Amino acid sequence: MGQKETFYRNWNGGGDFLRTVFGLGGLDHTNDSPAEQRYVNSLETSSMMAENDIGSLMPLVYTTVAFFVAVVLPHGSPMSNSHSSKKAFALLNWPRVLTSRNIWSISHGIFAASMFGSFWVQSAVGTIPLFGIVGFSWAVTCRIPYYLLHDELYRSSTQRNRQGDDLTDSQGLIHGIHNFSICLAQIVVLLMINTVWILASDDDGDSFLVWFLLLGGACALLAMYFTTRLREPENIKYEEIAMEEGDYGFSE
């Protein structure tokens, strides 16, 4: 299974999260009487100020989690830099079962759990852990897919070099397809969101936001399934290739 399908479904889930999670609205009280409306406005003003102060911690928690996950993730891909990758796994005591593919699958599961949790969480405090853990998924998505892509290109280039072929043009095409799949998913999600918002402008928008988040969770589960179908990179050692062709597996 190629990575581009998983990229597309992953960003279908991630796009609507990035578009809506920082813009959740309040309840609509336009049908209340004037006296009730003034009372509700007074309560909402004080409550909104308190919730905004608490809710502002959510982006901080999200970015902090993403930062620390990016730090502790093993640096380098297992194929192109097997020695450094093994050293990183040993240093951080990473279990061998946590391969690049499995870590990416787990990140999809965490994202889906967060999106589905938005159906029940209704407080500003609840959004802090709910969306803060998505920082893990974001950090993994910004790194692991490119490791897998690099490993696939490295494997192909090694085979082509052994056959005397040039893979330079093909590598550019593969990168272009992956970038296109990422951009296309975000465009599709934003068009869906804007279309529904226009059609439902007179209705309660909060319910539509929740359903969009649930849709993101469903897309994340689909991406998780496709991720499990990806082939694990083979552990090709530099030393073995260098003995055959020299210069770390690339002919001059």
Swiss-Prot record:
UniProt key word Cell division: no
Major localisation: membrane
GO cellular component, one term: plasma membrane
Effect of deleting the gene: Impairs the production of cyclochlorotine.
Name this protein carries in UniProt: MFS-type transporter cctQ
GO molecular function: sucrose:proton symporter activity
Glycan attachment residues as annotated in the record: N179
Keyword annotations of the record: Glycoprotein, Membrane, Transmembrane, Transmembrane helix, Transport, Virulence
Pathway noted in the entry: Mycotoxin biosynthesis
Lipid bilayer topology: Multi-pass membrane protein
Annotated family: Belongs to the major facilitator superfamily.
Protein role: MFS-type transporter; part of the gene cluster that mediates the biosynthesis of the mycotoxin cyclochlorotine, a hepatotoxic and carcinogenic cyclic chlorinated pentapeptide. Most likely responsible for cyclochlorotine secretion and thereby may contribute to intrinsic resistance.
Name of the encoding gene: cctQ
Chain ranges passing through the membrane: 54-74, 116-136, 180-200, 208-228
Cell location: Membrane
